[in-house]
Amino acid sequence: MSKYIGPDCRLCRREGMKLFLKGDRCYTEKCAFARRPYPPGQHGQERKKLSEYGMQLREKQKVKRIYGVLETQFRRYFEMAEKMKGIAGENLLSLLERRLDNVVYRLGFASSRGEARLLVSHAHFKVNGRTVNIPSYLVKVGDVIEVDERSKSKTRFVEIKEKYAKKPSPKWLEKDAENLVGKVIALPTREDIDMPIREHLIVELYSK
């Protein structure tokens, strides 16, 4: 499956909610969804009632877009979630939350998951003292995530420290905003997910 390279704002309009893919822009009047809260296209304002399958598919697409994951990898996460103890849907969300790019975003070390993915890919972060440039890297309890010392003086990280790093993070993470260091102190649970996600629909879709 190819990577989507179109405007991020079209994805928010397609899913009928803000996915916060553009960082600061999502909180301003420039947000395309705020101005046109309906699907893109000629007949976008004519919302159709979705079938059961349609709702399941839309929910899957929404979660994939929130976390920036393509189908093959998303399916792999679901298969992992099914093999874990507990509820498959909640396990799936926990795995997605544990992605390094998401953790960087949750710590406030990037304005969006998209930016976090880019910064991780460019080797600006270390995990337990070692450079990790794989956005899909799954963190575990005890892992320490930090901005590389050589990157801290870069203009973008100075801006990040001033604008985002001091914002609250989920309770499963702790951070030293001044030094741009974070630590995983617990695994994320369903209560830590702040987006309106109906994960049971995804489980139903993949269980057919």
UniProtKB/Swiss-Prot annotation:
CDD domains: S4. InterPro entries: Ribosomal_uS4, Ribosomal_uS4_bac-type, Ribosomal_uS4_CS, Ribosomal_uS4_N, S4_RNA-bd, S4_RNA-bd_sf. SMART domains: Ribosomal_S4 (SM01390), S4 (SM00363). Keywords: Ribonucleoprotein, Ribosomal protein, RNA-binding, rRNA-binding. One of its GO terms (biological process) is ribosomal small subunit biogenesis. Part of the 30S ribosomal subunit. Contacts protein S5. The interaction surface between S4 and S5 is involved in control of translational fidelity. Belongs to the universal ribosomal protein uS4 family. This is Small ribosomal subunit protein uS4. It comes from Caldicellulosiruptor bescii (strain ATCC BAA-1888 / DSM 6725 / KCTC 15123 / Z-1320) (Anaerocellum thermophilum).
